[in-house]
Amino acid sequence: MNADGPVVNVHVLFFAKSRELANTPRSKVDVPTKITASDLLDLLVSRFGLISIRDNLILAHNESYIDNLSDTVLFKEGDELAIIPPLSGG
């Protein structure tokens, strides 16, 4: 994992299939204050058993989508992270 600095506790919200796989609508997780989006995704997939939908997940940090997995994400204590799989239906 490419992470620097201290660790903070963030709130994680799960939607749709990610909620089903994680078996909870919300959780808390410790993350580095500075981490690449790719490493963050790997951490969340591993921690919450989301491997089956890994390639289709969208992450949002404090209600802003993380568009590029090479981006660095900066966290503060109590930040919010949403895990959003693509919605399906008709």
Swiss-Prot record:
Under the heading Pfam families, the entry gives: ThiS
* GO cellular component terms listed in the entry, alphabetical order: cytosol; molybdopterin adenylyltransferase complex; molybdopterin synthase complex
Task: Tell me which InterPro entries the record gives.
Answer: Beta-grasp_dom_sf (IPR012675), MOCS2A (IPR044672), MOCS2A_euk (IPR028887), Mopterin_synth/thiamin_S_b (IPR016155), ThiS/MoaD-like (IPR003749)
Mind telling me how this protein is modified after translation?
C-terminal thiocarboxylation occurs in 2 steps, it is first acyl-adenylated (-COAMP) via the hesA/moeB/thiF part of MOCS3, then thiocarboxylated (-COSH) via the rhodanese domain of MOCS3.
Q: Does the keyword Membrane apply?
A: no
Record carries keyword Transit peptide:
no
**Gene Ontology biological process terms from the UniProt entry:** Mo-molybdopterin cofactor biosynthetic process
Glycyl adenylate: which positions carry it?
G90
Q: Which residues constitute the signal peptide according to the record? A: none
Q: 1-thioglycine-modified residues are where?
A: G90
GO molecular function list: molybdopterin synthase activity; nucleotide binding
Q: Which domain of life is it from?
A: Eukaryota
Q: Which SUPFAM superfamilies match?
A: MoaD/ThiS
Where would you find this protein in the cell?
Answer: Cytoplasm
Q: How does it assemble?
A: Heterotetramer; composed of 2 small (Mocs2A) and 2 large (Mocs2B) subunits.
Q: What else is known?
A: This protein is produced by a bicistronic gene which also produces the large subunit (Mocs2B).
Please report which protein family the annotation says this sequence is part of: Belongs to the MoaD family. MOCS2A subfamily.
Q: What role does it play? A: Acts as a sulfur carrier required for molybdopterin biosynthesis. Component of the molybdopterin synthase complex that catalyzes the conversion of precursor Z into molybdopterin by mediating the incorporation of 2 sulfur atoms into precursor Z to generate a dithiolene group. In the complex, serves as sulfur donor by being thiocarboxylated (-COSH) at its C-terminus by MOCS3. After interaction with Mocs2B, the sulfur is then transferred to precursor Z to form molybdopterin.
NCBIfam families from the UniProt entry:
moaD
Q: What is this protein called?
A: Molybdopterin synthase sulfur carrier subunit
Q: Which species is listed as the source? A: Drosophila erecta
